[in-house]
Amino acid sequence: MAKRIDVKDLNIYYGKFHAVADVSLTVLPRSVTAFIGPSGCGKSTVLRSLNRMHEVTPNARVEGVVALDGEDIYGENVDPVGVRRTIGMVFQRPNPFPTMSIRDNVVAGLRLQGVRNKSELDEVAERSLRGANLWNEVKDRLDKPGGGLSGGQQQRLCIARAIAVSPDVLLMDEPCSALDPISTLAIEDLITELKKDYTIVIVTHNMQQAARVSDQTGFFNLEAQGKPGKLIEIDDTEKIFSNPGQKATEDYISGRFG
C-alpha cells in the first residue's frame, strides 16, 4: 500500500561535514516526486536518507524527522533493514546478480526473508515481472542469467526485484542515466504505471524527464562548494517549470547555470 512521506527539518552529516541543511517536504501516496538540481547539491543524499541507505557510509548521521505514514523511520528500535524493505531503492546503474537466473534475481529478497515455497516464489516472480513490464520479454528464458539482458531490461529486472518484496515506496536514483533513449522511454512509461500502486521519488539530471513523469518537483541547490545543499523550492511540476517561485529555480531550469 502506497504511503505518505513527511520530512521535517532534515539535516544530514558525514562526520563533521554538513551535507544537507533544513529540508522539509511532503510526498503524497501514489504520486511521483522528482528531485532536480546541479551535481553535489544533496538531492541523492536526501533520497538515500528516505530509507536510511546513506547509513552505509561511515560516520553518516541525521537530525530531524523522516516519517512514513506518521512513523519516524529514525525512531528508537526501528530496524534499518525493515525500513529498506518497506522503502525500496533502484540505483543509477542496473545491478542484477549477473550469474543468477532472471527468476532468482526477482525473488532474491523473498529468499532472504525465508520464503522457500516454489509455487509462491514463481507466482511472485511472474507478478513482479509483469509489474515491471518485462514478463512477455523474458517468460521463455526465466532460467537464463539476468546479466544476459540488455541494459534497459536489466533496469526493469531490478525494478521487479524491488517490488517483489511488496514495498510501499520506491526510490529511484537516476534510473535512466545509463540507458539509451528507447529504454529510457520504457522506464518512464513504467514509472507512470507504478505510481498507481506505489509512492515514488526519483532523482534525475534530466529536467525534461522530471517534467514528463512527476507530479511535483523539488529543486535543490547549494550556495558554494563546501556549503550544505538545500531544498530551494518544491511545488507542482507544472508550476515549477512554468512559473517557479524562486529566481534560482528559474535560472537552473532555463540553463543559466548547472
From Swiss-Prot:
It catalyses: phosphate(out) + ATP + H2O = ADP + 2 phosphate(in) + H(+). ATP binds at residues 37-44. It is a peripheral membrane protein. Keywords: ATP-binding, Cell membrane, Membrane, Nucleotide-binding, Phosphate transport, Translocase, Transport. One of its GO terms (biological process) is phosphate ion transmembrane transport. It is found in: Cell membrane. InterPro entries: AAA+_ATPase (IPR003593), ABC_transporter-like_ATP-bd (IPR003439), ABC_transporter-like_CS (IPR017871), P-loop_NTPase (IPR027417), PstB-like (IPR005670). Its main location: membrane. GO terms for molecular function: ATP binding; ATP hydrolysis activity; ATPase-coupled phosphate ion transmembrane transporter activity. One of its GO terms (cellular component) is plasma membrane. The complex is composed of two ATP-binding proteins (PstB), two transmembrane proteins (PstC and PstA) and a solute-binding protein (PstS). Belongs to the ABC transporter superfamily. Phosphate importer (TC 3.A.1.7) family. This is Phosphate import ATP-binding protein PstB. It comes from Nocardia farcinica (strain IFM 10152).
